[in-house]
């Protein structure tokens, strides 16, 4: 396998990573449809991604963005179909799933490239073992993180502003992480293969950190709002109770005077 082949992450790495990333979201959220429909939808989505990404692997820079738009659309429709989300919430979780998948595929292939470089050979069985082990570790951690974000909150309501924030973050992360692949002579592009891998992986990891930090912030703001709303309702009920009690006392006093 040549250096050029090693530099280009295979399409099926991304197809598997996107699928697993979306599965993490689906199986930590409330479902819109039954288990069998979700299973069928998972299979259809995976097959579509696998075929499309193998077909578009190594596509020209002109068609790169349209190809990514197709992939993102497939992921969005799959999440919306399976989860009890509004379109805004589906978009919010899609952005997280997409960047998570980008990081997983990038890190997994970088790790395999590192092994090939150290051993000075390409061993297919190690490629499979590496893929299974790295993906299992990454998505197990992401699953636990998503489950922890569900604590104390049944449903996360996303506003247009919050959706736009994560879209802008993801677009910036994706653009910066792919600069070296689209233009290796650019101002912010890496020259060596490992430099390119490091830039992409670290940028994707940073994007994940920012998105999860923002998710936590959105959750805390919503929890604070719900607590304040509940406190106001309880306060109003208490005031109404006090008024009712005072009215009853006045009526009783009048009856007593009579």
What does each of the following model-derived ranges do?
Residues 42-46:
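N-terminal, Lys/Arg-enriched amphipathic/low-complexity engagement segments
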Residues 6, 18-39, 52-168, 173-187:
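Juxtamembrane segments at transmembrane-helix boundaries
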Residues 141-155, 180-186, 204-236:
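Juxtamembrane or sensor-core-proximal signal-transducing alpha helices
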Residues 237, 244-258:
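Conserved DHp (HisKA) dimerization/phosphotransfer helix of two-component histidine kinases, i.e.
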Residues 5-8, 125-127, 192-197:
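Interfacial loop-to-helix junctions that mark the boundaries of transmembrane helices
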Residues 135-140, 168-175, 196-216:
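Alpha-helical membrane-embedded segments
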Residues 1-18:
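Hydrophobic transmembrane alpha-helical segments in integral membrane proteins
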